Amino acid sequence: MEGALTARQIVNEGDSSLATELQEEPEESPGPVVDENIVSAKKQGQSTHNWSGDWSFWISSSTYKDRNEEYRQQFTHLPDSEKLIADYACALQKDILVQGRLYLSEKWLCFYSNIFRWETTISIALKNITFMTKEKTARLIPNAIQIITEGEKFFFTSFGARDRSYLIIFRLWQNVLLDKSLTRQEFWQLLQQNYGTELGLNAEEMEHLLSVEENVQPRSPGRSSVDDAGERDEKFSKAVSFTQESVSRASETEPLDGNSPKRGLGKEDSQSERNVRKSPSLASEKRISRAPSKSLDLNKNEYLSLDKSSTSDSVDEENIPEKDLQGRLYINRVFHISAERMFELLFTSSHFMQRFANSRNIIDVVSTPWTVESGGNQLRTMTYTIVLSNPLTGKYTAATEKQTLYKESREAQFYLVDSEVLTHDVPYHDYFYTLNRYCIVRSAKQRCRLRVSTDLKYRKQPWGLIKSLIEKNSWSSLESYFKKLESDLLMEESVLSQSIEDAGKHSSLRRRRRTLNRTAEPVPKLSSQRSSTDLGFEAKVDVTGKRKTVDSYDTALIVVMSIFLLLLVLLNVTLFLKLSKIEHATQSFYQLHLQGEKSLNLVSDRFSRTENIQKNKDQAHRLKGVLQDSIVMLEQLKSSLIMLQKTFDLLNKNKSGVAVES
């Protein structure tokens, strides 16, 4: 079994506040008493459901609304407080595969199938799950999840995105085991991660919904905190058999999905407790060191605790106009890099951005210096060419990036930059553009938090098929872009940390060694403080090398295509010759067949003529015999008539003689 995760994996070993959090859990809301593990299969009948739940919001997305109504109608025994968070098309493996749909809410995992009016309904309380694992269908296809409770095993397969589905189910399961309740903000973040822009909410609606204070749900009657703690310890003790190796294996499989950093599956500690509101003044010098009781970390980001020496230098994130875009949150991480250094890395012509551009096949980068606008914001424009690998588009596309540094930013403390990117040579480029928001917040002297959110903006509304094509390609490109950016920033962070450690080691040496090191120090400084002419020359060399590589690639591609076309021509000629031979053989065979038919006709004609002559002779012979017989009979008749005539003459003579005598 791959990627086995248990209930203890969500708890960090070094988290000293775990005991306090477990004692201060929000309690469950009272609801109807239902069986916590219901499995049924029945013939479908007439069922009606009265939609009268406590639904304090209205969603304009027909897709989510329809899914939620289906969920309510199919699982009427669940409490009204359970709202649909995600649904997945999958199949339940029993004696046969039962194709259906898996519904996930905050505390329940439900499956429903209807095949030829035969219903299969499964309801599993998340708190009853002992452990869950990623599995392979037929030990080959990695698209299955196995859910194990105390008495049963459920094997769900045919997931389209198994890793992403497993990650969300696992984290909600951990949330239930720790008696954590999702805040309204976390609920909406999960909803938007699973359903994306299909929710159709504008900025005002989102701000209003996120500003609603989450209701603390009371613990169900008749259940004490001691019982909860005992049940939670029992759950944990059942999962202790899994080692930390499974944790690392699961953490390695999570980034394969590419969706874990999206849409803020968990805000920072300071954000999860406060309401989203308008940006306050950035000139405030308020410094507060807080230790909030955080909810479950749904984004697997590190929330590093600051020591007392660095807390006084940090920026209070509550006083920062931080508002992510509605699209997706791709980066939310604390880097061991100062805020000023992070800004220089990302928004100047640094070696880091040059290396990053080369790795992303971005050439001909030209940028203007930062200029102050009339409103106080600073503006910078970049133009560059992107080498494309998509065969459906051209080889290159020109792009224009407009970067805006807002006036609320404070040097070395906080930077808020919006980047508007337009590509000019891709299909339907006049329909949309990309808006990226970079938020750099100082956390300590050599530490800052970087948040990058992005959204697709449309200049004119495309058709549904075109819109889905644009979003699919754009989101995949943005995801790979920011994954690479985060990876390079982590590498840069390790390099900077190593240089700081080396500097600390050098400072602790003897004075003689320190004197010798002074003479050796300017060498790396010279390499890091080269003139802009050297940088420009180096950039030109990189661009020239990139173009030579592209040209050589094009030449090789042309040669390969020419050879391929030549082979196709030779193949066509060979096929033509074979076809002509086959046609000639067919015609020859047809002519031979005609000649055979003609010869058969001649023989048959001769035979028929001979038969006719013989028949005519036989008929003539028979006719001659008949005529001869007729002549004989006529002769006999003639003789008979002559005799009769003679008899009559004799009688007449006798009568005349008698008359004379008398």
From Swiss-Prot:
Keywords (A to Z) from UniProt: Cell membrane, Endoplasmic reticulum, Lipid transport, Lipid-binding, Membrane, Transmembrane, Transmembrane helix, Transport
Tissue: Highly expressed in the liver. Also found in the testis.
CDD domains (alphabetical): PH-GRAM_GRAMDC
Subcellular location per the Swiss-Prot or TrEMBL entry: Endoplasmic reticulum membrane; Cell membrane
Membrane topology: Single-pass membrane protein
Function: Cholesterol transporter that mediates non-vesicular transport of cholesterol from the plasma membrane (PM) to the endoplasmic reticulum (ER). Contains unique domains for binding cholesterol and the PM, thereby serving as a molecular bridge for the transfer of cholesterol from the PM to the ER. Plays a crucial role in cholesterol homeostasis and has the unique ability to localize to the PM based on the level of membrane cholesterol.
Domain writeup: GRAM domain binds phosphatidylserine in the PM and mediates protein recruitment to endoplasmic reticulum-plasma membrane contact sites (EPCS) in response to excess cholesterol in the PM. VASt (VAD1 Analog of StAR-related lipid transfer) domain, also known as ASTER (Greek for star) domain is a sterol-binding domain.
UniProt protein name: Protein Aster-C
Organism whose genome encodes this protein: Mus musculus (Mouse)
Gene, per the UniProt record: Gramd1c
